[in-house]
Amino acid sequence: MSLVETVRNTLVPVHKEGYRFIAIFFVVSLILGLLWEPLMWIGFLLTAWCAYFFRDPERMTPIDEDLVISPADGRVSSIATVTPPEELGLGSEPMLRISVFMNVFDCHVNRAPMSGTVRRIAYRAGSFLNAELDKASHDNERNGLVVETSHGAIGVVQIAGLVARRILCWTTENASLEGGERFGLIRFGSRVDVFLPEGAQPRVSVGQKAVAGETVIAEFGSSKGPLISRRA
């Protein structure tokens, strides 16, 4: 293996959405260095943090249509049975909601929790409350996806937080998504809610760490044995 290949395999890729921010941090660091050298080194540390924030590592996603995979890196902040947001069009019957909160040190690339077809994308403007608060699901700016899966329609909602002020969603209505596939990103601290129909059983606990594209957060039916994974 060549040196270039070794470095490429060792370093975690940075998502292209972060290039502009990294460049801004770097240039500002150089300018600050002209005023006072220690400021430049502080700026370089912040530049390194920015690159770390926008990291986009590969993940090994379990292949099983009965499994629901975490859509985000972070901490499971809530597991509850609630009425889904009206804009999703999922009806008024309560659904299982599993929430994953991302702090500013978590990877913020969002991934599809199940394979299926995107039937609806609904954006709603709102506040920028702390995303860990339960009322953030209703009050904060959010972008919701309805994905038709083999177990029925599920909802995936990207929620802006106290620091996050930009929700990005790259998929489109009628597009097909594979479980673990990247579909969006939220900048600088946020939350993702997954709404699941009857039959889904949670496989995580509140406070547990979840890894996007890898951690099984819920399941339809019972486990059938060893998992098979694919790189995503």
Curated annotation (Swiss-Prot):
InterPro entries: PS_Dcarbxylase, PSD-A. It is an enzyme of class 4 (lyase). Pathway: Phospholipid metabolism; phosphatidylethanolamine biosynthesis; phosphatidylethanolamine from CDP-diacylglycerol: step 2/2. Catalyzes the formation of phosphatidylethanolamine (PtdEtn) from phosphatidylserine (PtdSer). This is Phosphatidylserine decarboxylase proenzyme. Belongs to the phosphatidylserine decarboxylase family. PSD-A subfamily. GO terms for molecular function: phosphatidylserine decarboxylase activity. Its EC number is 4.1.1.65.
